[in-house]
Swiss-Prot record:
Tetramer of two alpha and two beta chains. It catalyses: (1S,2R)-1-C-(indol-3-yl)glycerol 3-phosphate + L-serine = D-glyceraldehyde 3-phosphate + L-tryptophan + H2O. The gene is trpB. The modification N6-(pyridoxal phosphate)lysine is found at K104. NCBIfam families: trpB. Belongs to the TrpB family. Its EC number is 4.2.1.20. Keywords: Amino-acid biosynthesis, Aromatic amino acid biosynthesis, Lyase, Pyridoxal phosphate, Tryptophan biosynthesis. GO terms for cellular component: cytoplasm. InterPro entries: Trp_synth_b_CS (IPR006653), Trp_synth_beta (IPR006654), Trp_synth_beta/beta-like (IPR023026), TrpB-like_PALP (IPR001926), TrpB-like_PALP_sf (IPR036052). This is Tryptophan synthase beta chain. Pathway: Amino-acid biosynthesis; L-tryptophan biosynthesis; L-tryptophan from chorismate: step 5/5.
Length: 410
């Protein structure tokens, strides 16, 4: 199965010429970065239309990444949620089966191919759960590029397996101890590096966040998820899904799934954030549920802030959702009512992780487990035989130690 590059978008679904989704997005960056962002935007606009670039990208997605990823019917999980009023048909979009074990390689591969054509020999990236770092290190190894990954010290402790994987792949993993030593701090440090080395270095931002053109660019490299999903749904039952479900931290896996269906109003789009220890505790990462509009890492979006407008620290058992901001397009979809956003706690996510493992023999990442956990709330509200597609954004090998420590602490 081949999937063509995503078609031109309507005005409602794309950033405008200033990189804005409604009031969100934009470029709030130091003057030294403006030429680099303009160069990146121009390169992306050119190469997305270039047949040679697209041919190389599609060949690598097929032969190196292993696309298309399967759309798997979770029979026992579906039966678990069936009752008198509803027999849900739950499908998993198996991004966990991609090379490196998550959706992140779609974007890393696309951006490295862009960086090569732009003449950049040094690649930097931030990572939280480590999956974006592993994906970036993997593609840099494939193309012989220097690679530096910024990672918070708390996340390095939580994700030791991925730290070792990155180093085995030849990347330098730079610890970040500022702040709480998590994803926000790693992102800030990566941006500082980029400002200093902008002539030789390309920054592979790992989510649909940051200044324009990153939210658009990252979305486009992940849009293959939704494009494949549409084609697979048509092949399996001749129609579209009723509900799409994905976890949201920065929001790249969700946007990759949602983008193809934004203009299909009959398809519900549901994003699930991390409620951490509870929405009323202050220890959560539910940006779209509890946040206010502000600027972080170069873009206007919803943020977790205090009364003085200072960004506050986020919390989630999942390192990949532990971020106090969110991609600007998600903020836009929330404001126009096109997508719904809810949250689940650490406890609910761990339970959902174990549930999928024991019902389907699939160990999901703790990030993915947040989307799975929302089935507990969603399914009792449904009737009939709704078809639900969940983006299984990553595998859970990296989280086994975290889950073990969680149970030991109970």
């Amino acid at each position: 199965m081949t999937v063509a590059p995503s078609a031109a978008l309507s005005a409602a679904a794309r950033p405008d010429a200033r990189g804005r989704f409604g009031r969100f997005g934009g470029k709030y960056v130091p003057e030294t970065l403006m030429p680099a962002l303009s160069e990146l935007e121009a390169a992306f606009a050119h190469y997305r239309q270039d047949p040679d670039f697209q041919a190389e990208l599609q060949q690598l997605l097929r032969d190196y990444v292993g696309r298309p990823s399967p759309l798997y019917f979770a029979e026992r999980l579906s039966a678990h949620y069936a009752h008198d009023q509803v027999q849900p048909q739950i499908y998993l979009k198996r991004e966990d089966l991609n090379h490196t074990g998550a959706h992140k390689i779609n974007n890393a591969l696309g951006q490295v191919l862009l960086a090569k054509r732009m003449g950049k020999q040094r690649i930097i990236a931030e990572t939280g759960a480590g999956q974006h770092g592993v994906a970036t290190a993997t593609v840099c190894a494939r193309f012989g590029l220097q690679c530096v990954i910024y990672m918070g010290v708390q996340d390095m402790e939580r994700q030791r397996l991925n730290v070792l994987r990155m180093r085995l792949l030849g990347a330098e993993v730079a610890p970040v101890s500022a702040g709480t030593g998590t994803l926000k701090d790693a992102t800030s440090e990566a941006i500082r590096d980029w400002v200093t080395n902008v002539e030789t270095t390309h920054y592979i931002l790992g989510s649909v966040a940051g200044p324009h053109p990153y939210p658009m660019l990252v979305r486009e490299f992940h849009a293959v998820i939704g494009a494949e999903t549409r084609q697979q749904c048509l092949e399996k039952w001749g129609g579209l899904p009723d509900i799409l479900l994905a976890c949201v931290g920065g929001g790249s896996n969700a946007m990759g799934l949602f983008h193809e269906f934004v203009e299909e109003p009959q398809v519900r789009l549901i994003g699930v954030e991390a409620a951490g220890q509870g929405l009323d505790t202050g220890h959560h990462a539910a940006t779209l549920t509890k946040g206010e509009v502000g600027v972080l890492h170069g873009a206007m979006s919803y943020l977790l802030q205090d009364a003085d407008g200072q960004v506050v620290e986020a919390h989630s058992i999942s390192a990949g959702l532990d971020y106090p901001g969110v991609g600007p397009e998600h903020s836009y979809l929330k404001d126009i009512g096109r997508a719904e956003y809810y949250s689940v706690t650490d406890t609910e996510a761990v339970a959902a992780c174990v549930r999928l493992a024991q019902l389907e023999g699939i160990l999901p990442a703790l990030e993915t487990a947040h989307a799975l956990a929302y089935l507990e709330t969603l399914c009792p509200q449904l009737t009939g035989q709704p078809r639900i597609v969940i983006n299984c954004s990553g595998r859970g090998d990296k989280d086994v130690e975290t889950i073990g420590r969680y149970f030991e602490a109970q």
